[in-house]
Amino acid sequence: MTTQFHVVVVGAGYAGVMAANRLLAEHPEVAVTVVNPRPVFVERVRLHQVAAGSGTATHELSDLLHPRVTLHVGTAVRIEPYAVSLADGTVLPCDAVVYAVGSTTGSGAIPGAEKAFSVADLDSATALRDALLEADDHASVVVIGGGLTGLETVTELAQSHPRHTLVLVGDPGAALPVNTQRYIRHRLDELGVQVRSGTRVAHIDDGSVVLDDGSEIPATLVVRTAGFSVPDLARRSGLPVDDDGRLRVRDTLQAVDGSPIVGVGDGMPVVGVGDVMPVVGVGDAVVVDGNDHLRMSCQAAMPLGIHGADTVWQLLQGREPAPLSLGFVTTCISLGRDRGVVQLSARDDTPSRWALRGRLAAPVKEAVVRGTIHTMQLQARGRALPSRRGPDTAAREKAHV
């Protein structure tokens, strides 16, 4: 079948891959070009393993993407009316853009943060792995942040590098139920991780981390897991963004009203769309109106990719897309290779009273992580599983019972 529309997907993370695969599996009249800085897919949920030297996190994109995807290895520098401009000078004409650029750890407001490592991307995790291998025995490694990434990182490092001293600065699992927090503390004690909670980092010096109570922690290496930043592509392109630079999208995932991406002059016409090129945002680098419960996670990114693809298709057909309805199921945390937590949650991501903790949780977490890869491959063949509906949908259903 002759293609009628060309869609450019910027970014090949969880959301971008799912969006590309969904479009091509469902609509043979669409051509898709995926723009990504490297030819591999990076499993961000395994980057703490890369840092610890206990696992890998890459897959060839050719093994995950629909066979009709055109992969362009490069970096987008600007989204123009009906085109995406790349750093190598290439200009990709298109009828719609899926904005899926992802996120990374931000420098934040901590003085000296540039001295710290992170596990937010493959290069950073690899640099930390190399630094750990080169460090002398009994090095002091300070991990900043008691959230999910901080917990997975500090426990993985402690288990893989028992000769080093691991210190966690933060309140471990503070958003989780008390029983789960208690188990996490037990696991940290088991691994010999020192915890400094109830305090914040004032600044990072060469050889130490200074806390806001004036105390210092010796630090051969520092790892920051708190905070985030996103690429400034949306801002540079004149698209609507929030204070953090995330693309602002409506509940359909289309960029909010006021987007200056307008086709004029010789701009490629879009059948049924009028004079505005659809820009649809998915993944970590977007903020969705009316969906404050969405957190940065592959659990959200993959359904966002699917919904974003469906929105693109509806817009290309001149139809009003459906609003997003996305609910959470669980929070999975690895605490080393052989322990973990699977915390069930309500649709709005509020933790429930039920959780699986300890040895039994570790293989469940591993199965979930492997399942994300399988799900992307299934979507390329048109067989992805539906996601859980969101909290607003559940409330409406209850009101009509």
Regions found by a protein language model. Give the residues of each.
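FAD-binding core/adjacent interface of flavoenzyme oxidoreductases
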Residues: 2-4, 69-140, 223
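Beta1-alpha1 glycine-rich phosphate/pyrophosphate-binding loop at the start
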Residues: 2-70, 152-178, 401
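Short hydrophobic core segments
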Residues: 10, 92-105, 209, 217-228, ...
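Internal hydrophobic alpha-helix adjacent to the cofactor/substrate pocket in enzyme cavities
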Residues: 20, 291, 299-326
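A Rossmann-like FAD-binding core segment of flavoenzymes
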Residues: 69-80, 84-85, 92, 161-251, ...
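FAD-site-proximal beta/loop scaffold in flavoenzymes
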Residues: 114-137, 216-221, 225-303
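Rossmann-like NAD(P)H-binding beta-loop-alpha module
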Residues: 128-164, 169
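C-terminal auxiliary extensions adjacent to catalytic cores
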Residues: 337-401
